[in-house]
Amino acid sequence: MAEHILVGLSSAPSNARIIRTAATMANAFGGSFTALFVRTPNYEAMSEENKERLRQNTTLAQALGATIETVFGDDVSYQIAEYARLSGVT
C-alpha cells in the first residue's frame, strides 16, 4: 500500500516549509499527499494578509502535487483526526 501523507493548510508563514516537507516525504515513499484546510467560523474574521498567505500556501501545495481538501468545523484537531481516520492517511 502506498503512503498517504496529510498536511494541514494554514496562513502561518511556516506552513510553506511544512508543505514542502510533506511533498518530499510523499515522493520519497512513492505515495501521495493531501493538504487539508479546516474552515472554522473564524475564517471570515481573518485579515486579508492571512487569507492571501493561505491562498499562496494552497497554490504551493497544488503545484507540488497535493490533493486539496476543505472541511468545516469548530474543532480543528478533531476535524483533522476525523479526516485522517476516514481517508486512510498513513
Segments predicted by a language model, with ranges:
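Structural beta-alpha unit
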Residues: G65-T90
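Small/aliphatic-rich secondary-structure junction motif
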Residues: A2-A63, E69
